[in-house]
């Protein structure tokens, strides 16, 4: 029976620590040296992998002790059996022998204990080495690397080949602190398995370095899962760093999200002040039992500080217990930088920042030529601040060494967490540059691009490279006959490429992004007039006929004919995107700081531009050219008369009423006049909070409506949120002054944006409104896991908990939170708010899981009144009765509605028959 069969039937036991057990043998320097000819000036004690060569009897004894204790899987003593790690001891030439002998020793012991009923397996241990591909060893030189992908690949390949020869059953890549190192190990493992003609399961085990829930190289668990999602992984788990109890929230997250078997082998608790581990088998076994009872795991074992006593205890508690059933991976494109990006339903469009492209930004090109990387990074940072969800990086210029510049800049980016948190788009026409770039990013990137231009063989090889390095891909609609310019050619090439990728390469459909070519219109050539419309039609066809695939394009190409007229260009882009997104375009390389939105365009201009973009009126291109010329002439006249065009526009909206000015400022993301207008509002409104609840909330609601209608995009919403924060900051001192001195605190409320969600503007407004009403507010920020909320709620003895979330996955996270609250014994009322939340969702999914009230809050202004009722014992009882009645009505209505929905088979029976 193979391990793939065994794991379906029961929970498997992995062995415990090797180093801890070795310490018990009190070995000396002489034991480590054995008969090897070694340098006298070096101390080899502690280089445990040497013992495979010098004291194999000790390693055999340890394996046998674990097998006797009940281990199903023993781990080879090869954690550091690779040249990179052994270089510290000048033993590079012995690394392969250590790996080979380590595998042979474990194989021998496993075979001794294997039976038909209980087969024993050998996991070949691959450690992370003592160096990292993703981080600089020198704080003064962030682009420097001690280790390259290629050198580590060579080192790991030698180790894996030796372990396969030695007879391992599984490859275990463990104690992962840098995802890029792990990707190299997976790549080397797959490569060596192909050479050897074997297919071994690959296990990954991550180390969370602190309570932030991130790896040492900065990735969240979500981001890590995205980074390795292209690989054939057998299991994913956690080891080292923490004890069992501290791993609980991270294990629950993995079990809920990872489409693999789940492993956990924690340390024997946290080390004490002497560096020793205080947990014993008796104290840790019950902790592990809870994970088994909750069906969170498939493989359990031990790391630092654990011994065969721990494993014997684990063997008893797994008997008769059901293993974890892996979840399915979402059929959506999921990317990552330091954080995960998931194209979920509420994200209608992914704006890819275009300014870090030497071909598209003269400033960026100049900075790269001048080696002014720090300022070049500010361009990247500004795009992220402006709402870019992905960053395009391109170094293709005849006067640049593109490969060197790409690698250097990407290494610089990885040192900037605020930039590195978003995924990257690797953009180059030189395939060697693309490969070099993929070898220095730990996240899941997008390659821009591949095509059939050089034929099918080249296309397949490039696609395999993309898959090998764990990326998604942009596919240009370009083949051996040239670039597709008509609708028919676009869909012909897309269909052919999709079939090759999914059927011949095995590329995940959701990781394919087609670029059907956005080409310039209004060029004076009639055959170009339909280019935009044909792109839109092609986008719609791709989404309907190529399941899972996405559509992207370089939007600025569309308006190339109007260089120098930014208003016309941005207006054309806004109109094009409005229609293309509705047709299915979900990615686009754009300037995230664009100022013109679809809603801003005057009706007369809008008709002309739509006629051109949609090619619906002959001669409309001439009308657009006339409009562009008039705008330029007006600008020239104003310059001659000493009038600034932009200032005249400002005067127009500045003459509106105070409320309209504030709404306009929010909608456009303009902070310039906020100080002036807020102080005028303070003279008009009796309380500072009334300014928030009045014109500012109205502005936010308008932005929400425009965003929902597709007339504003995420970068513009981000600017609005930033402007709202600025407005609240101006009002804050006045809010503090207006608090009634000496008045008793109305209550203590804890606010948090749930784990996985970085949006905080709504939560921040709630905090201000609650503070104005004399509530003490404890704001925990964004991406807050349940365990931290519980801990803070207990420490502060809060009266209310407010959970906020903007994105769809936050709905499930809120469900998880209240379940955790109940398990922790909390009976604190919970208020739920955020753009994707609803009273129906609370009634169906959240409220039934919690014993105390869970209340959906429509907007910030009603929070204080709801809170006051919840904290008044007399009023709370009646309120909860009415609330429960409301929830029961909602549930009953939903159930009745669901009963009216026929099954698919029944609906097919009722179909209209046109042939009788």
PLM region spans:
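Domain-level signal for soluble alpha/beta catalytic cores
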Residues: 1-916
């Amino acid at each position: 029976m193979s391990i793939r069969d065994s794991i379906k039937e029961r929970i498997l036991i992995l062995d415990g620590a090797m180093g801890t057990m070795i310490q018990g043998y009190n070995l000396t320097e002489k034991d480590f040296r054995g008969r090897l000819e070694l340098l006298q000036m070096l101390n080899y004690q502690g280089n445990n992998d040497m013992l495979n060569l010098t004291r194999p009897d000790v390693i055999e004894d340890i394996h046998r002790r674990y097998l006797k204790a009940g281990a199903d899987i023993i781990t080879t003593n090869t954690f550091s059996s690779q040249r990179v790690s052994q270089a510290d001891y000048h033993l590079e030439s012995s690394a392969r022998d250590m790996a080979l002998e380590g595998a042979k020793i474990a194989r021998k012991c496993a075979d001794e204990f294997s039976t038909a009923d209980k087969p024993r397996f050998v996991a070949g241990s691959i450690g992370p080495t003592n160096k990292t591909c993703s981080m600089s060893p020198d704080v003064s030189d962030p682009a420097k690397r001690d280790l390259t992908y290629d050198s580590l690949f060579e080192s790991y390949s030698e180790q894996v080949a030796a372990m396969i020869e030695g007879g391992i059953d599984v490859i275990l890549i463990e104690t992962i602190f840098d995802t890029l190192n792990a990707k190299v190990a997976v790549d080397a493992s797959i490569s060596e398995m192909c050479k050897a003609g074997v297919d071994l399961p690959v296990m990954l085990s991550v180390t969370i370095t602190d309570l932030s829930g991130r790896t040492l190289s900065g990735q969240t668990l979500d981001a890590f899962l995205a980074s390795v999602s292209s690989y054939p992984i057998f299991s994913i788990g956690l080891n080292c760093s923490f004890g069992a109890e501290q791993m609980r929230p991270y294990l629950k997250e993995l079990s809920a999200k990872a489409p693999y078997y789940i492993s956990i082998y924690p340390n024997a608790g946290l080390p004490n002040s002497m560096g020793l581990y205080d947990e014993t088998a008796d104290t840790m076994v019950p902790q592990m039992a809870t994970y088994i009872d909750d069906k969170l795991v498939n493989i359990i074992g031990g790391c630092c500080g654990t011994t065969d006593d721990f494993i014997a205890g684990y063997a008893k508690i797994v008997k008769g217990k059901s293993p974890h059933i892996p979840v399915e991976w979402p059929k959506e494109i999921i990317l990552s930088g330091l954080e995960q990006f998931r194209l979920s339903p509420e994200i209608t469009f992914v704006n890819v920042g275009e300014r870090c492209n030497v071909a598209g930004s003269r400033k960026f090109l100049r900075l790269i030529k001048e080696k002014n990387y720090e300022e070049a990074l500010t361009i990247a940072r500004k795009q992220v601040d402006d709402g870019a969800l992905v960053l395009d990086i391109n170094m293709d210029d005849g006067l640049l060494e593109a490969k060197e510049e790409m690698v250097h800049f990407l290494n610089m980016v990885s040192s900037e967490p605020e930039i590195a948190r978003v995924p990257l788009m690797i953009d180059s026409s030189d395939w060697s540059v693309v490969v070099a770039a993929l070898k220095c990013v730990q996240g899941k990137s997008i390659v821009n691009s591949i095509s059939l231009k050089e034929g099918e063989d080249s296309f397949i090889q490039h696609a395999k490279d993309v898959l090998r390095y764990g990326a998604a891909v942009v596919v240009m609609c370009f083949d051996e006959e040239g670039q597709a310019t008509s609708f028919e050619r676009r869909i012909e090439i897309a269909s052919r490429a999709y079939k090759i990728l999914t059927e011949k390469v095995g590329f995940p459909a959701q990781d394919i992004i087609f670029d059907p070519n956005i080409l310039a219109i209004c060029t004076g050539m009639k055959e170009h007039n339909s280019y935009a419309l044909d792109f839109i039609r092609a986008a719609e066809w791709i989404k309907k006929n190529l399941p899972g695939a996405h559509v992207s394009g370089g939007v600025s190409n569309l308006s190339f004919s109007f260089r120098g007229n930014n208003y016309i260009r941005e207006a054309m882009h806004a109109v094009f995107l409005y229609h293309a997104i509705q047709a299915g375009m979900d990615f686009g390389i754009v300037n995230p700081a664009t100022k013109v939105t679809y809603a801003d365009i005057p009706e007369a201009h809008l008709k002309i531009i739509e006629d051109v973009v949609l090619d619906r009126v002959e001669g409309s291109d001439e009308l657009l050219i006339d409009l562009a010329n008039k705008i330029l002439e007006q600008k020239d006249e104003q310059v001659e008369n000493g009038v600034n065009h932009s200032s005249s526009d400002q005067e127009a909206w500045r003459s509106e009423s105070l409320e309209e000015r504030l709404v306009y400022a929010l909608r456009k993301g303009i902070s310039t006049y906020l100080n002036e207008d807020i102080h005028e509002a303070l003279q008009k409104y009796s309380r500072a909070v009334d300014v928030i609840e009045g014109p500012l909330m109205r502005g936010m609601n308008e932005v929400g409506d425009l965003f929902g209608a597709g007339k504003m995009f995420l970068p513009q919403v981000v600017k609005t949120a930033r402007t709202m924060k600025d407005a609240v900051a101006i009002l804050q001192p006045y809010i503090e002054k207006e608090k009634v001195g000496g008045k008793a605190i109305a209550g203590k409320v804890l606010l948090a944006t749930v784990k996985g969600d970085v949006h905080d503007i709504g939560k921040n407004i709630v905090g201000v409104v609650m503070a104005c009403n004399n509530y003490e507010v404890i704001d925990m920020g964004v991406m807050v896991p349940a365990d931290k909320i519980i801990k803070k709620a207990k420490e502060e003895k809060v009266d209310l908990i407010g959970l906020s979330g903007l994105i769809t996955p936050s709905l499930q996270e809120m469900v998880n939170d209240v379940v955790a609250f109940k398990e922790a014994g909390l009976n604190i009322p919970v208020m739920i708010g955020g753009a994707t939340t609803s009273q129906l969702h609370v009634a169906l999914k959240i409220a039934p899981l919690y014993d105390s009230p869970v209340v959906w809050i429509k907007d910030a202004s009603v929070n204080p009144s709801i809170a006051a009722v919840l904290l008044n014992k007399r009023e709370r009882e009646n309120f909860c009765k009415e609330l429960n009645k409301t929830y029961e009505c909602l549930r009953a209505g939903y159930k009745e509605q669901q009963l009216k929905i026929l099954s698919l088979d029944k609906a097919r029976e009722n179909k209209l028959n046109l042939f009788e």
